[in-house]
């Protein structure tokens, strides 16, 4: 039963690019994306604050769902749409502060045990990964594959879910066929020969999400 402690999100968030710069945020919002995440790693808050401010402003301009990865204090301070946290961040984050600020929360998971941890936090959505091998970041866990993803989707029922990890244009239809609400992509867009074409094709498959 989907009863999060944080504001709800649509079951279908649509195509959900995860990018590391404001430039990518802007060009993808201009291209029609309406759910997006800014993920800048391993910098101090003061080093990324200007980027967070700019990304949130763009999200508002395009009426988009803009999630900030990890930098939850800045997301609260500048009132982002939401925050995305990894498992390792849950214990060190003031979830009640995020909740009190009215921000949505997404949480990464990689197996059933981590799904249990995520469900205990009652986030707005749960990310499931990595589905396929990925070069975007080092992963300690093995790829889950489509059968395991489908099993997680069945377990989570009406909970909004996002599949992530090695999802290409060619693989996207099979991933969505598991019943997952949304697909997060990184290199399928940022490393595409023509990112505009790749984005348009992925939007045609995954949509922009429900209101």
UniProtKB/Swiss-Prot annotation:
Cofactor(s) the protein needs: Mg(2+)
The reaction(s) this protein catalyses: 2-[(2R,5Z)-2-carboxy-4-methylthiazol-5(2H)-ylidene]ethyl phosphate + 4-amino-2-methyl-5-(diphosphooxymethyl)pyrimidine + 2 H(+) = thiamine phosphate + CO2 + diphosphate; 2-(2-carboxy-4-methylthiazol-5-yl)ethyl phosphate + 4-amino-2-methyl-5-(diphosphooxymethyl)pyrimidine + 2 H(+) = thiamine phosphate + CO2 + diphosphate; 4-methyl-5-(2-phosphooxyethyl)-thiazole + 4-amino-2-methyl-5-(diphosphooxymethyl)pyrimidine + H(+) = thiamine phosphate + diphosphate
E.C. numbers: 2.5.1.3
Enzyme class name: transferase
GO terms, biological process: thiamine biosynthetic process; thiamine diphosphate biosynthetic process
Pfam name, any one: TMP-TENI
GO CC entries: cytoplasm
Pathway: Cofactor biosynthesis; thiamine diphosphate biosynthesis; thiamine phosphate from 4-amino-2-methyl-5-diphosphomethylpyrimidine and 4-methyl-5-(2-phosphoethyl)-thiazole: step 1/1
Cofactor: binding details: Binds 1 Mg(2+) ion per subunit.
Highest taxon above the source species: Bacteria
Keywords attached to this entry: Magnesium, Metal-binding, Thiamine biosynthesis, Transferase
InterPro entries registered for this protein in UniProt: Aldolase_TIM, ThiamineP_synth_sf, ThiamineP_synth_TenI, TMP_synthase
Binding site for 4-amino-2-methyl-5-(diphosphooxymethyl)pyrimidine: 37-41, 69, 108, 137
Entry similarity comment: Belongs to the thiamine-phosphate synthase family.
Function: Condenses 4-methyl-5-(beta-hydroxyethyl)thiazole monophosphate (THZ-P) and 2-methyl-4-amino-5-hydroxymethyl pyrimidine pyrophosphate (HMP-PP) to form thiamine monophosphate (TMP).
Protein name per its UniProtKB record: Thiamine-phosphate synthase
Classification of source organism: Bacteria, Pseudomonadati, Pseudomonadota, Gammaproteobacteria, Enterobacterales
């Amino acid at each position: 039963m989907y009863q999060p402690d944080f504001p709800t999100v649509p079951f279908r968030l649509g195509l959900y690019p995860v990018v590391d710069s404001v430039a990518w945020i802007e060009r993808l919002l201009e291209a029609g994306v309406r759910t997006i995440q800014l993920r800048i790693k391993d910098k101090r808050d003061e080093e990324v604050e200007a980027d967070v401010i700019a990304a949130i402003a763009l999200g508002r301009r395009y009426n988009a769902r803009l999630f900030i990865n990890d930098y939850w204090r800045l997301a609260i301070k500048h009132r982002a749409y939401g925050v995305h946290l990894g498992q390792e961040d849950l214990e060190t984050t003031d979830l009640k502060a995020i909740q009190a600020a009215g921000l949505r929360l997404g949480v990464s998971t990689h197996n059933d045990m981590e799904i249990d941890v995520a469900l205990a936090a009652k986030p707005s959505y749960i990310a499931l990964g990595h589905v396929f091998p990925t070069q975007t970041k080092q992963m300690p866990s093995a790829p889950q594959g489509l059968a395991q993803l489908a099993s997680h989707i069945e377990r989570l029922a009406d909970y909004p879910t996002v599949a992530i990890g090695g999802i290409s244009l060619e693989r996207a239809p099979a991933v969505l066929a598991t019943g997952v609400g949304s697909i997060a992509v990184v290199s399928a867009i940022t490393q595409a020969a023509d990112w505009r074409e790749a984005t348009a094709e992925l939007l045609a498959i995954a949509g922009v999400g429900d209101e």
